[in-house]
Amino acid sequence: MYKKSIQVAAAAIINTSGEVLIAKRPDDKHQGGKWEFPGGKIEQGETVLDALTRELHEELAIQVVTANPLIQITYEYPEKIVQLDVWQVTEFSGDPIGNEGQSIQWVAKTQLFNFQFPPANRPILQALLLPDYYLISGDFEDQADCLRRVQAAIASGIKLIQLRTTEKPIPLDLVKALADYCYQTNVQLLIKQSNCSREIYNLKGISGVHLTVAELMDCNGAVITQYQKQGCLVAASCHNAEEIVKANALALDFITLSPIQPTASHPGQLGLGWKTAQQLIKLAQCPVYCLGGLSSSDVGQARQVGSQGVAGISQFWPS
């Protein structure tokens, strides 16, 4: 059955306190009565930024000064397909008002999940909460060495970490030490699912699990729902369209896409390159971190192709 497809520009408007502006949809509209990020349809001949600038002036009486891409989402409702192109507006002039009679509200990012949004908006909430960089731990000598490296990474500004180790089961003392420190410093710590017992992912300071490709392809929605109901983030490693489609079906919180560039750890394996990465990222219905042969200086390029940011091991793991 043919479904109408509409292209929408939406804005996550951030004030100087780090709060996000949301607006309530009119009751008589599609997904009426729910909260949304301001914006509207992209008219023929408009760029996304043109549409966003026009819509925010019409809806909120503000002028966009600085805006950057945040995430692109394609979501299929029973009655239509919505293609959302979301930008983060970090500078604007004027005081926002509900210019069309709509309710508006400034909300702390961490409180966004307390509001009811259309289903297509869920990835936007995650994108706003996730940082630009995702550290995947490298080799370490012992617990003290691992903790020292994690502390150094956090001191440099890292806010999202995956503890990656081949030890099974993973030493509980190590996880507790890292979880305690991450909790104290407001850093999110993920554990590989294969290393993650119920005792571990219930620890204060453990924010979620990261699935390998094999775990992703073998996983079912009930497992993911169980994790997410307990407040856990669920991420996965992806390398191709098939794996991204599976991640979409499971409604994961974010994924990594690799390898973007050739890496020393996989000699002879070609990287996807930025053009292919951009095409694959467009398939994803959640934030995507680019991984493989990248450094922190690549975050701008990653953002330009629609990524949340960059992930890394060797370039991010302190010596």
Model-assigned labels for residue ranges:
Residues L130-D145, V234-A236:
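Active-site mouth loops of central-metabolism enzymes
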Residues G208-G221, F254-G268, G293-S319:
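Glycine-rich phosphate-binding active-site loops on the catalytic face of alpha/beta enzymes
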Residues I73-D95:
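Active-site-adjacent beta-strand/loop module that shapes the phosphate/pyrophosphate-binding cleft
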Residues E19-E59, L70-I71, Q188-L190:
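Conserved Nudix-box catalytic region and its N-terminal flanking loop in Nudix hydrolases
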Residues V86-Q88, P96-L129:
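NUDIX/MutT-family hydrolases
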Residues L135, I161, Y201, A247, ...:
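Conserved, mostly hydrophobic/aromatic
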Residues L174-S194, V213, G221-N240, Q269-S295:
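Alpha-helix-loop-beta-strand connector modules within alpha/beta enzyme cores
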Residues M1-V20, Q72:
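Conserved N-terminal beta-strand and adjoining loop/helix that marks the start
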